[in-house]
Amino acid sequence: MAPPARLTPVPTEIIDAFRAVAPTLEDFARQHDLLIERYRRGKPAWELRFARRAGGEAVVTISYREQTGHVLDVSITWWVDDREDRTRRLRSEKVGVYDRRTAPSELRRRLAAGLAAIDRWTPADLGPAHGPFKAWTEHPAGASLPLR
């Protein structure tokens, strides 16, 4: 059996970029009862995750844009898994960009706009089912996420 793959350490410039916006992201997540996942699977991003009352899971993703360094992309995704058919339906869109040289209130506005957009989405807004995927884990991840 092969040893598990190791994730590459997150570069210092990415950590520094998120350190500058961490208070805003952490405060927003706390206010809206969102789970923060930092650098999930080694990605240069923070994710604000939650389970939706409408079903499935959703995430507001704040990604480091490597070409510029001072710009963070804000995007949103909602997905619903059909565990029996091993398929997933989702919707995703970019909310906008945040220039770290501007006020933190600009980032908060983009986060709020993304969360509001997710809250407006209905199952009819989801795309077609994709899959089938390999066997799911026994317990869906959404079971441990805050419900919104």
Write out the residue ranges for each language-model feature:
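Surface-exposed charge patches
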Residues: 27
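Short aromatic/hydrophobic-glycine micro-motifs
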Residues: 30-35
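Intrinsically disordered, low-complexity regulatory regions enriched in serine/threonine/proline
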Residues: 2-24, 36-148
